[in-house]
């Protein structure tokens, strides 16, 4: 008789095998043993894996659940007929309705490779049998929920298209009640001040936000002159139009001494050029004008000598006596 000899596992293979074996449930094995023996009427024995290895009990089990599932059951002691029985059982439970991911492989049972998966398959098979109405005294497996198929006519289907379910979200019964129109004035009040309640819905509580009593008081109109003062000099501002130096300063700049736009100004170096004979314009340091743009007498150097201030001789008489017969010949 041919046997499949498998050596011991080492390293990672041994670690994986031990991890799979640790998930094996001894209580589930005992429940499965009782359930299979009750359904088939055949004894498994003390060793669960050896009792199911030949596949005879498994084929008898599926034939009890679904008669005629396995046509021929091999009772030979050879390995290949036993593997054939296991293969026929796997095909039969697939046709019975088992999911592919719940079914073990033939080597998991025959070579004792993964008895945890074999146990999972048999528990799922017991639950499927319970779902289909096959009941026993052994309560094992989970009964699957039955499919509830409902049919609706066209009228109900069209009516349901206009209904918004709560699965799409809810607005918690929100409405526009109390909302004011655009541009409507709304007052502010603070509930903590124990003031009267708002008269209408146009009043906003400070819990909704506040502008801290901001207003346009003291704000000057565009173009209004605003003075500058220094707080360090303990000078009191005249009015709200005064700007503190903390806001910046232009260092008391003014237009004093600035010439009129378009007025010619000559540039010369006294080291290399003679004194100018035309008026010299300073940048506001001199001058007698009210706005600093006029030229003083000291800024002007005449190019002519001093005028004569003496008396002129009276060489000619100032008055001439002319007679009636006298005249002037030209």
Curated annotation (Swiss-Prot):
Bias (Basic and acidic residues) ranges: 306-318
Spans of repeat Calponin-like: 164-189, 204-229, 243-268
InterPro entries associated with the record: Calponin-like (IPR050606), Calponin/LIMCH1 (IPR001997), Calponin_repeat (IPR000557), CH_dom (IPR001715), CH_dom_sf (IPR036872), SM22_calponin (IPR003096)
Annotated positions of the N6-methyllysine modification: 158
GO cellular component term, pick one: dendrite
Taxonomy, superkingdom: Eukaryota
Residue intervals of the Calponin-homology (CH) domain: 26-130
GO MF annotation: an example: actin filament binding
Keyword line: Acetylation, Actin-binding, Calmodulin-binding, Methylation, Repeat
UniProt region (Disordered), positions on chain: 279-330
GO biological process, one term: epithelial cell differentiation
Gene3D superfamilies: Calponin-like domain
Modification N6-acetyllysine occurs at: 23
Function: Thin filament-associated protein that is implicated in the regulation and modulation of smooth muscle contraction. It is capable of binding to actin, calmodulin and tropomyosin. The interaction of calponin with actin inhibits the actomyosin Mg-ATPase activity.
Family: Belongs to the calponin family.
Record-given protein name: Calponin-3
Species of origin: Rattus norvegicus
Gene: Cnn3
């Amino acid at each position: 008789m041919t046997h499949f000899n498998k050596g011991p596992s080492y390293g990672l293979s041994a670690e994986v095998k031990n991890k799979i074996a640790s998930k094996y449930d001894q209580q589930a094995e005992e429940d499965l043993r009782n359930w299979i023996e009750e359904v088939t009427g055949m004894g498994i024995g003390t060793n669960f894996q050896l009792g199911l290895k030949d596949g005879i009990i498994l084929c008898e089990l599926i034939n009890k659940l679904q008669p005629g599932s396995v046509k021929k059951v091999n009772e030979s002691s050879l390995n290949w007929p036993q593997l054939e029985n296991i293969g026929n059982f796997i095909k039969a439970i697939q046709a019975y309705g088992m999911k592919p991911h719940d079914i073990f492989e033939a080597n998991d049972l025959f070579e004792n490779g993964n008895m945890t998966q074999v146990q999972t398959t048999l528990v799922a098979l017991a639950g499927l049998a319970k779902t289909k109405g096959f009941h026993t005294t052994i309560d094992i497996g989970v009964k699957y929920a039955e499919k509830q198929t409902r049919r609706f006519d066209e009228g109900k289907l069209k009516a349901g298209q206009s209904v918004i379910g709560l699965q799409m979200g809810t607005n918690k019964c929100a409405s526009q009640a109390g909302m004011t129109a655009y541009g409507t004035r709304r007052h502010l009040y603070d509930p903590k001040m124990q003031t009267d309640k708002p008269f209408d819905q146009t009043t906003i509580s400070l819990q909704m936000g506040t502008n801290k009593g901001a207003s346009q008081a003291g704000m000057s109109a565009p173009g209004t002159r605003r003075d500058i003062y220094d707080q360090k000099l303990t000078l009191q501002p005249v009015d709200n139009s005064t700007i503190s130096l903390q806001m910046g300063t232009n260092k008391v700049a003014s237009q004093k001494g600035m010439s009129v736009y378009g007025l010619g100004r000559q540039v010369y170096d006294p080291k290399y050029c003679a004194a100018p004979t035309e008026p010299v314009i300073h940048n506001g340091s001199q001058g007698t004008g009210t706005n600093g743009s006029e030229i003083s007498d000291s800024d002007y150097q005449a190019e002519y000598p001093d005028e004569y201030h003496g008396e002129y001789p009276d060489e000619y008489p100032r008055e001439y006596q002319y007679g009636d017969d006298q005249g002037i010949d030209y």
